[in-house]
Amino acid sequence: VNDEMLRQELSLGHVDGGGAHLLDLLNSPSLNINGMSSGQTGAHATNVIPSTATADLDLRLVVGIDWQKQQDRVVDYIRSQGYFVVETPPSREILLQHAKVALVKKDTAGYNAARTPMDLPIAEEVLTAVQAARGTVIEWPTMGGSVPLNAMEQAAQTRTITVPIANHDDNQHAANENLRLQNLWDGIETMASLLYMR
C-alpha cells in the first residue's frame, strides 16, 4: 500500500497514526465517529440552543481485544472526562445533580475480531485457486471490516478466509458505492476457481 498515494487520492492534508504505515495501523484497534448531531443547520437553523448532542461510535477491533471490554473502556474514558454516565434517559433529578451527563447505549450484538494465519494449508489452497484464476495477486494478510468471522468460526468450528473482489475506491457503504465491471467479471472467475478447489 502506498500511503502517500492514498493520501493524495483522498485529498487528506493530515492523517492520524503518528507516521505509521496503513498496514501497521490495520493491526491496531480504532474508534470511528460515524455521525454527530445537535440542533439544525443551513435552512433549518434556528436560534435555539440545543440541550443534547448525539454521537454514533464504531469500535474496530483486532484479535485479542474483547468487544464488550472495549465498550467498557470507552465508558470509562467518558467518565474520566467528568461525565456521569447513565444507560437509560436521565431523570430530572440526575440532571440537576450532575453538571455533565452522558447517556451511553452499548451495542448488545457485537463480536470479536478474527484472524486466520496465511500459512495454514487451507489458506495456501485458497491462494493457489485465486492465482489460477487471476495470475499474480496481492496477498493481504489483514483486512479491516465488520464481518462476523469470529462468530462464524465459533459456530462452524473452523477457520474463515475472505477473498475480496471490490475495487479499492468503491466507496463502500456510501451513497455512491460502486463496483467496477471488470472487478465483477474477475470476481466471478475467482469464485468459480474457489468452487472447484480441491
Walk through the language-model features, giving the residues of each:
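Active-site helix-to-loop segments that bind/position phosphate- or nucleotide-bearing substrates
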Residues: 57
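An extended, acidic, His-containing surface patch that forms the Zn2+-binding/catalytic region
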Residues: 1-52, 60, 65-73, 81, ...
